[in-house]
Design a protein with these regions (language model features):
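Beta-strand-centric surfaces of beta-sandwich/beta-rich domains
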Residues: 1-112, 119-263
Length: 263
């Protein structure tokens, strides 16, 4: 394409191409195949860890994986983590896999982890060969808390599914759309929550507040907000879901535009 054609592309295309100064988009996808009848996060393992700044922790890959998911193996060789540190800044760190053993711990200390994905693999991925062999679990350095999972899901997914995200320091998050998919054999209730002031260390704390609620969802729905919902810096944005009976599968896709140097 020539320059004139490129510059005439719509706003969203320019964002996706990285052409908008101090702006980027997160398509934050989450799934939970076993939502119960009480509210839980829409994430692979039903968790989104939110410790206070004083409890920041290094992370690692949990022991118990597959021997092929190792630094020189046929499976996942390294994993990249995205999250927030105790200063409220976004951090990204790569860690080498270590087969069935626990990996080395990260250099960074995390208070949020909103995405992990396979970075390098020993296998050229195809429709019949994925990029990791087993579920990869991310845990705290002490080995006492699971934080996230890169699951198989019938086929190696290569990434986490976490329907929550946190707005870094010196940014504003604009939620412009949400796609919801549910188990159509039952009804599902979902709520979008926000909690500002994630670095607060003593009361009074900012409350956790319901921003949107969807009751009795029985089919996929897609909602675009003509005026996006604003989430200020240092704010958690999360989706919880519950089903009417038993357990059920739920997935969400959040389109969040992050604007830097905004208040």
């Amino acid at each position: 394409m020539d320059v004139r054609q490129k510059t005439s592309l719509p706003w969203g295309h320019q964002i996706a191409r990285g052409n908008m100064f101090q702006a980027h988009v997160h398509h934050q996808f989450g799934r939970n195949v076993a939502c119960p009848t009480t509210y839980v996060p829409v994430s692979d393992n039903g968790l989104y860890r939110t410790p206070q700044a004083g409890a920041a922790t290094a992370l690692r890959i949990k022991a118990g994986g597959n021997a092929a998911d190792t630094a020189n193996g046929a499976g996942a060789r390294s994993v990249r983590l995205w999250g927030i540190n105790a200063s409220g800044d976004e951090i990204v760190e790569d860690i080498a896999t270590n087969g069935a053993l626990a990996s080395s711990v990260t250099t960074n200390q995390f208070i949020r982890l909103y995405m992990a994905e396979v970075l390098t693999s020993g296998t050229y991925g195809t429709q019949s060969a994925g990029s990791h062999v087993a579920t990869i679990t991310i845990e705290n350095a002490a080995g006492t808390q699971d934080w996230a999972q890169i699951q198989l899901n019938g086929f190696p997914s290569g990434t986490t599914g976490i329907g929550s995200i946190t707005v870094p320091r010196n940014h504003v998050g604009l939620l412009s759309s949400i796609q919801i998919n549910v188990d159509q054999t039952k009804t599902t209730d979902l709520i979008i929550l926000k909690r500002e002031g994630i670095l607060q260390t003593s009361a009074p704390y900012s409350p956790i507040v319901k921003m949107q609620e969807f009751i009795g969802v029985a089919r996929p729905i897609s909602i675009r907000f003509d005026v996006p919902i604003k989430f200020p810096a240092l704010t958690d944005l999360g989706v919880l879901a519950k089903v009417s009976n038993g357990t059920g599968a739920v997935s969400v896709d959040l389109e969040v535009l992050m604007l830097e140097a905004e208040t």
